[in-house]
Curated annotation (Swiss-Prot):
Catalyzed reactions per annotation: Exonucleolytic cleavage in either 5'- to 3'- or 3'- to 5'-direction to yield nucleoside 5'-phosphates
Gene from which the chain derives: xseA
Keyword flag Hydrolase: yes
E.C. number: 3.1.11.6
Enzyme class: hydrolase
GO process terms (BP): DNA catabolic process
Record flagged with keyword Transport: no
HAMAP family the record matches: Exonuc_7_L
Listed name of the protein: Exodeoxyribonuclease 7 large subunit
Record keywords: Cytoplasm, Exonuclease, Hydrolase, Nuclease
Organism: Pasteurella multocida (strain Pm70)
Compartment list: Cytoplasm
InterPro entries the UniProt entry points to: Exonuc_VII_L, Exonuc_VII_lsu_C, OB-fold_nuc-bd_dom
GO molecular-function terms, A-Z: exodeoxyribonuclease VII activity; nucleic acid binding
């Protein structure tokens, strides 16, 4: 035999691969029967019509997204992949999503429009507009009598009473709702009286929310110059408007929080920033005060009056040393004279007396010469020190015609920026001070 011989396992595997590759995913409508849910959480059921039936499975991670509880006898629309359970040779459907039969047709339309608009780029993230950092006014496109509007207004009044609100009333359910929503979006864009728009309504069935899945509404949102927040239904409800809008809020209340500022949080942030500013200013003032004290100390140590006092003290010390030196020499010579006089008194002989008188006269002459020489030398030293002291004295600079300007606190003025017009200035000269008032400041050109 030239034909390939399959084992049962090989045949079932081949059929499974063919089914999965050829059919992949299909939409199927039918009646539920034999519905079971074991402890694993998976759903097992049969879909049938008047002529046939097929086994189906829907795993737990998928059936958690279904918004209703399947019942036997219920007509549903499922999106499923075709497969074959190899151990028993039973072909089956692996269900990806499930909707009631009426909503199922709408879901097909939803998926088709979603794919079309996505292909056209209406969902592109880079085209979405950002909300202003702080909205001053917000528009609300919704039913004027719906609970969603009251929820939004309540949140806005609590969080940001200063926010201006403009309501664009429209139907949010029924045949005319889509056209009215488009008209209100276009009206808000023409008026340009708000910073952002909230477009939405409260929860409902897929049919109730269908106006937000219409193509005309999607295109009006896309072409809006104002940023739009979609706030349709509950968190589990997803519409075409959510994909096109610049921002999606899970509920109308959440949309109100997105466009409003929490005043309490802003006040807390303001207090925090004020505390930081005060601390920074305190640090800056302390740094500047420390630097000012250091500069004052340096100025005090380098002040001309202080230097003059130091030189004067040095001159007094030198004069004292000169006086002490001259007194010491004089006392020494007087002591020598007393010794000689005592020797003369002990020897009464005229000859000796005459000789001693001559010696005394000579010593007196020599003493006078020595005293004059020493006194002249010390005077020369003193004059030299005075000349040196005078040459380094700040008063010498004054004598040559220079002066020093100081402010009212005695701080030397070296730059124009240290004084201002109208301020009192003291100019120190060699023989006194001039007190004047600044009338003009002229920078060096």
């Amino acid at each position: 035999m030239s034909e390939h011989i399959y084992s049962v396992s090989q045949l079932n595997q081949t059929v499974r691969v063919m089914l999965e590759n050829q059919l992949r995913q299909v939409w199927l409508t039918g009646e539920i029967s034999n519905f079971t849910q074991p402890v694993s959480g998976h759903w097992y059921l049969t879909l049938k019509d008047e002529n046939a039936q097929v086994r189906c499975a829907m795993f737990r991670m998928k059936n958690m997204r279904v918004s209703f509880r399947p019942q036997n006898g219920m007509q549903v629309l499922v999106h499923a992949s075709v497969s074959l359970y190899e151990p028993r040779g039973d072909y089956q459907l692996i269900i990806e999503s499930m909707h009631p039969a009426g909503e199922g047709l709408l879901q097909q339309q939803f998926e088709a429009l979603k794919m079309q608009l996505a292909a056209e780029g209406l969902f592109a993230q880079h085209l979405k507009k950002s909300l202003p950092p702080f909205c001053k006014s917000v528009g609300i496109v919704t039913s004027q009598t719906g609970a969603a509007l009251q929820d939004i207004l309540q949140i806005l009044r609590r969080r940001d009473p200063s926010l201006q609100v403009v309501i664009y009333p429209t139907a949010v359910q029924g045949k005319e709702a889509s056209a009215e929503i488009v008209q209100m979006i276009e009206l808000a864009n023409r008026r340009q009286e708000v910073d952002a728009l909230i477009v939405g309504r409260g929860g409902g069935s897929l049919e109730d929310l269908w106006c937000f899945n219409e193509e005309m509404v999607a295109r009006a949102i896309f072409h809006s110059q104002l940023p739009i927040i979609s706030a349709v239904g509950h968190e589990t409800d997803v519409t075409i408007a959510d994909f096109v809008a610049d921002l999606r809020a899970p509920t109308p209340s959440a949309a109100a929080e997105l466009v409003s500022r929490d005043q309490q949080a802003l006040l807390q942030q303001l207090v925090y920033q004020r505390q930081r500013l005060e601390m920074a200013l305190d640090r800056l003032f302390k740094q500047k005060d420390d630097r000012l004290q250091r500069l004052r100390l340096r100025l005090h140590n380098q002040h001309p009056q202080r230097q003059l006092s130091a030189q004067k003290q040095l001159m007094q010390q030198l004069a004292h040393r000169l006086d002490w030196s001259m007194q010491a020499v004089l006392q020494q010579k007087q002591a020598q004279l007393r010794v000689l006089w005592a020797r003369v008194e002990k020897n009464p002989l005229p000859f000796t007396l005459q000789k001693q008188k001559q010696d005394l006269a000579q010593l007196k002459v020599r003493l006078d010469v020595a005293l004059k020489r020493e006194l002249t030398f010390k005077h020369h030293q003193f004059a030299a020190l005075c000349t040196k002291l005078d040459s380094i004295s700040p008063l010498k600079v004054f004598a040559r015609g220079y002066s020093i300007a100081q402010n009212a606190q005695g701080v030397a003025i070296t730059q124009l920026k240290q004084v201002s017009v109208g301020e009192r200035v003291i100019t120190r000269l060699a023989d006194g001070e001039i007190v004047s008032q600044v009338t003009d400041l002229r920078p060096r050109s």
